Amino acid sequence: MSSIVVVGTQWGDEGKGKITDFLAEQSDVIARFSGGNNAGHTIQFGGETYKLHLVPSGIFYKDKLAVIGNGVVVDPVALLKELDGLNERGIPTSNLRISNRAQVILPYHLAQDEYEERLRGDNKIGTTKKGIGPAYVDKVQRIGIRMADLLEKETFERLLKSNIEYKQAYFKGMFNETCPSFDDIFEEYYAAGQRLKEFVTDTSKILDDAFVADEKVLFEGAQGVMLDIDHGTYPFVTSSNPIAGNVTVGTGVGPTFVSKVIGVCKAYTSRVGDGPFPTELFDEDGHHIREVGREYGTTTGRPRRVGWFDSVVLRHSRRVSGITDLSINSIDVLTGLDTVKICTAYELDGKEITEYPANLDQLKRCKPIFEELPGWTEDVTSVRTLEELPENARKYLERISELCNVQISIFSVGPDREQTNLLKELW
């Protein structure tokens, strides 16, 4: 029995899809456990680039199962568009499995997301407007429609009519807007469900069978720890728990099945949307990182905010997600900078702190305390071992590992699959 969880340690976009794809080659099952199509994974190999949102990164290995767990919220229409796009490019998707307990995103969730963000005005949280939050709200309110319900025509019809009646009153009272009608939704989404029917099953049983058979299971996280609804920069967070602990809830396996947790980070920091970002850069170094690193959101296309590496953030992520190994991506992006910086602590009201504050107002007052290290100019994109890295780049990574108290097991020097390097066996 062996399993690895891949989680983002920052605010998402760390390169989890790339690392999951890299590790998937030695896995038997790859499973997503949280989020929805608000996530964006970019995978590059064989001269081709693929952008995924809902489909697990393991889909590219046709002999392995790619599982969407019960903790994921699924927009059936968006999922079919993604699958059709892969099929058109010659990627088979018959190895996909979808939990029959996964919640369904419907048009009224997208409308609600839009209206609620508009109502917030200056207090907007930067939602992707994919209906993720409203779908999770319906789940907790126990009015959500699950994949198992979508497949049964009478069940779906009954639940949809009831929900639209409720949403109509809510939309009118809160936003003075109308809810998408039953006729706007039913036929299209029932048909989408029927197209997905062959993939829908009890994925918890699939995972349990894999463990019993001593197969290797890889759990693929979405977003990042700092977007976690409990442990992130609340309220500027996602609506689920991207931390490793949610694997058990989001896939239906026990905690004893988790063997290792790989925390994925960039050699710097990035963030999309609003919210605190203590090490954010607004100067030429920031411009360099954004352009060289192609820092634009996979899902939204928005320019990402960028900043120096923050060890306060990563120590927090290591603790709340139980990270055993670190994967550092995008080392090549920092090439050419005279000086690179690592945030080692914050100054809050004249005092040095080393842990991430829970209070948002305190966080806004935090000033990063930096340690400066010399940069490097050598091309690193073909490097395959730590020893081959320029001395300054190697010392930079070693200092990150030391500050965060976690070993580096993977490092990446470019976007392609072949530019990802394994320092130790993980399975």
UniProtKB/Swiss-Prot annotation:
PANTHER family membership: ADENYLOSUCCINATE SYNTHETASE
Source species of the chain: Staphylococcus aureus (strain Mu50 / ATCC 700699)
Gene Ontology cellular component annotations, sorted alphabetically: cytoplasm
Pathway linked to the protein: Purine metabolism; AMP biosynthesis via de novo pathway; AMP from IMP: step 1/2
Phylogenetic classification of the source organism: Bacteria, Bacillati, Bacillota, Bacilli, Bacillales
Matches recorded under InterPro entries: Adenylosuccin_syn_GTP-bd, Adenylosuccin_syn_Lys_AS, Adenylosuccinate_synth_dom1, Adenylosuccinate_synth_dom2, Adenylosuccinate_synth_dom3, Adenylosuccinate_synthetase, P-loop_NTPase
A Gene Ontology BP annotation from the UniProt entry: 'de novo' AMP biosynthetic process
Binding site for IMP: 13-16, 38-41, 128, 142, 223, 238, 302
Cofactor: Mg(2+)
Residues binding Mg(2+), per UniProt: 13, 40
Protein name: Adenylosuccinate synthetase
Chief localization: cytoplasm
EC number annotated for this UniProt entry: 6.3.4.4
PROSITE patterns per the UniProt record, alphabetical: ADENYLOSUCCIN_SYN_1, ADENYLOSUCCIN_SYN_2
Binding site for GTP: 12-18, 40-42, 304, 330-332, 412-414
Binding site for substrate: 298-304
Family of this protein: Belongs to the adenylosuccinate synthetase family.
Functional summary from the UniProt entry: Plays an important role in the de novo pathway of purine nucleotide biosynthesis. Catalyzes the first committed step in the biosynthesis of AMP from IMP.
Cofactor note: Binds 1 Mg(2+) ion per subunit.
Chain's gene name: purA
Superkingdom field: Bacteria
